[in-house]
Amino acid sequence: MMKRFLAFLIGACVVTAVEAQQSFWLGADISGTTELEARGYQLRNAQGEPRENTALMRELGLNAVRLRVWVDPVEHGGFCNRDDIVRMALRAKDWGMALMIDFHYSDWWADPGQQNIPAAWKQMTYEEMKKALAAHTRDVLQAIKQAGVEVKWVQVGNETTNGFLWPVGRAQQHMRQYAGLTDAGYQAVKQIYPNAVVIVHLDGAYDPNRYDFIFDGLRKYHARFDMIGLSIYPYWDMRGKHTQSWQETVEKATANINRLWVKYRKPLMVVETGVESKKPVEGKEILAAVIDAAKNKTNGHCQGVFYWAPEAEHHYPLGAFQGGRPTAIMEAFTEASR
């Protein structure tokens, strides 16, 4: 009996050690993968060998993928609709990568500057919209589940610093309704994936006030969530004169992460970050600093870092590729994965 107990104890320790190694996540939002492929764009590794995007992220040391969902992007090629997401989710599964689903609750981009109601929902009342949001959430997640893919995290909204589904869920005017819509999403997620971690995601990690505004409001109206998601973009913070240097952005974001844990007792995740692609050497330094701060300066409360669209080039200044190949920026992930 004692031998059996000792064997169980040793096995439990091994499992715990493995889980500890995976407790910090290195991820990327590669939602544009199928659109790039449809345009005939070929990605390659640093050696010039052709690679599919998901496989390339795994090769670079990443262990998680984030995929955005649009409600009905028929005017935008149908990319990031339910069926497209299932295709990309299967690739993440094939490469053994954890999956985050990011619901925009819009037919196209949703961010702090625009949170447009999907065309099919525009004439709905608040109560009808709650039901539509929940049904859409269940529909997409059920399709992913039926494909045999586990979902580890689900974002209920994307950068909802000012709420979403404007004007119905605009937080400044209708916090109660924003909270109600958020909780409807939470309940829908748990119906399909009871163990999925539900994230509420805001931008501007340097700024504690915007986080207090949203999360105090959600708490006041009893909206549930499991994790706080943050965006850290030193480039945009400096352009907007919110910070004077990338170091200041990282320092303020780290302080905010630690403060948020104390106040709300929820784990956190950097679900979006990016650095200037034209400066890959400095970019690697910045990304390495973000990863180090999240991993080593938050007492384990920040559980990972996701890069937004590393493969993006041309009109987007914060990708991490040039000529279809990863730059030195991505080495920050590779080195952190060792």
Task: Tell where the protein language model's regions lie, with residue ranges.
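Positively charged n-region of N-terminal signal peptides that target proteins for export
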Residues: 1-5
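Acidic (Asp/Glu)-rich catalytic clusters
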Residues: 22, 52-61, 87-98, 142-149, ...
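N-terminal substrate-binding region of glycoside hydrolase catalytic domains
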Residues: 22-98, 104-133, 139, 243-245
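Hydrophobic faces of well-ordered beta-strands that scaffold small-molecule active sites
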Residues: 26-28, 65-67, 99-103, 152-156, ...
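Active-site beta-loop-alpha junctions enriched in small/polar residues
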Residues: 31-33, 70-72, 104-108, 156-161, ...
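Aromatic-rich peripheral "rim/lid" segments of glycoside hydrolase catalytic domains that contact
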Residues: 38-43, 109, 255, 259-265, ...
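Active-site cleft segment of glycoside hydrolase catalytic domains centered on the general acid/base Glu
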Residues: 80-86, 111-225, 237-255, 279-291, ...
